[in-house]
């Protein structure tokens, strides 16, 4: 929490932007006034009132209790790639201590990694590597070992490949679902800029821009919200909930790079955690995302610069 506050205060942005971010973190107004406006409480009150008016009275909730972003959440990974036979990759994974099976295409959740076929991937020796349920930092450590093996086997990706992340959604309230959909929609322009062009307007990971904020806000059930967003080929896939009790994020490009995977998994974890308390406002800039620390903001700032060339 203190690190996030320091990061916000150090930003080269407006006082109003800092006030909004601190408010969303749950910092009391009097404290915000002390830190940002030299004690001008009225300025803070007016800035927050204008923020609410800009959002048309929407429920941009302050985080009234400190959110715990410790990563102990269940998650899953699907890695689409090519250039290694499934049999060889399975053998190398087993030698590295990773339990894996070679199977036909299926949606069954298994207690082991599975190598399946996927007709949407182009290239030689294509495959999809699907994880079992992973948990927190221990799960990331196992994923890193898998990435070492992918590197050993010279596994490659191209524009037909994606990295899909499932986040456990079993305990989501309907308010969390709405906040999550709205937050991703509002952040979509920012996320698009740190994703390759092939993942910005892709049939297999379509955006949420076709759904109005009002349609999301008025959804009363997960099925109703799913119906308004559409089929599973969207950046946020709610169909995964009925099958796996997860929400699937499909936008990330195919990769075998553990640093990219880790940062994206943690981004999604923090996004989901934040959605339990509120939603990210529309037109939020990368440096203003309330749930990212300074290190992740820098990482995605550099990714954005690299992909803008």
Annotate each language-model stretch with its function:
Residues 1-13:
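Basic, amphipathic alpha-helix used for nucleic-acid engagement in HTH/winged-helix/SANT-Myb modules
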Residues 10-27:
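Short, amphipathic alpha-helical "recognition" segments used to contact nucleic acids or chromatin
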Residues 19, 41-45:
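Helix-turn-helix DNA-binding helix
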Residues 25-35, 162-164:
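Short, charged amphipathic recognition helices of the HTH superfamily
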Residues 31, 42, 49-156, 170-309:
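C-terminal accessory/tail domains of diverse enzymes
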Residues 36-37, 48:
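A general structural motif at alpha-helix termini
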């Amino acid at each position: 929490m203190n690190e996030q506050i320091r990061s916000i205060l150090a930003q080269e942005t407006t006082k109003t932007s800092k006030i909004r971010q601190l408010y969303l973190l749950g910092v009391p107004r009097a404290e915000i006034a002390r830190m940002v406006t030299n004690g001008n409480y009225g300025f803070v009150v007016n800035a927050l009132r204008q923020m609410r008016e800009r959002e048309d009275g929407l429920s941009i909730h302050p985080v009234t209790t400190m959110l715990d972003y410790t990563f102990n959440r269940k998650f899953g990974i699907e890695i689409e790639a090519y250039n290694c036979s499934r049999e060889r990759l399975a053998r190398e994974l087993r030698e590295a201590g990773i339990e894996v099976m070679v199977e036909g295409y299926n949606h069954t959740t298994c207690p082991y990694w599975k190598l399946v076929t996927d007709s949407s991937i182009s290239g030689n020796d294509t495959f999809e590597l699907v994880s079992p349920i992973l948990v927190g930092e221990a799960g990331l450590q196992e994923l890193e070992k898998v990435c070492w093996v992918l590197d050993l086997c010279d596994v490659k990706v191209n524009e037909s490949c994606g990295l899909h992340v499932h986040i456990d959604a079993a305990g989501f309230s309907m308010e969390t679902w709405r906040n999550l959909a709205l937050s991703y929609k509002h952040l979509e322009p920012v996320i698009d800029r740190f994703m390759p062009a092939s993942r910005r307007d892709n049939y297999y990971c379509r955006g949420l821009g076709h759904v109005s904020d009002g349609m999301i806000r008025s959804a009363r059930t997960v099925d109703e919200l799913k119906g308004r967003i559409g089929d599973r080929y969207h950046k946020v896939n709610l169909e995964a909930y009925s099958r796996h009790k997860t929400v699937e994020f499909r936008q990330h490009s195919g990769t075998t790079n553990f640093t990219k995977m880790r940062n994206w998994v943690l981004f999604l974890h923090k996004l989901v955690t934040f959605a339990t308390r509120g939603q990210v406002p529309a037109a939020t800039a990368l440096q203003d995302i309330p749930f990212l620390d300074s290190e992740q903001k820098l990482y995605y700032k550099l990714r954005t610069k690299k992909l803008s060339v």
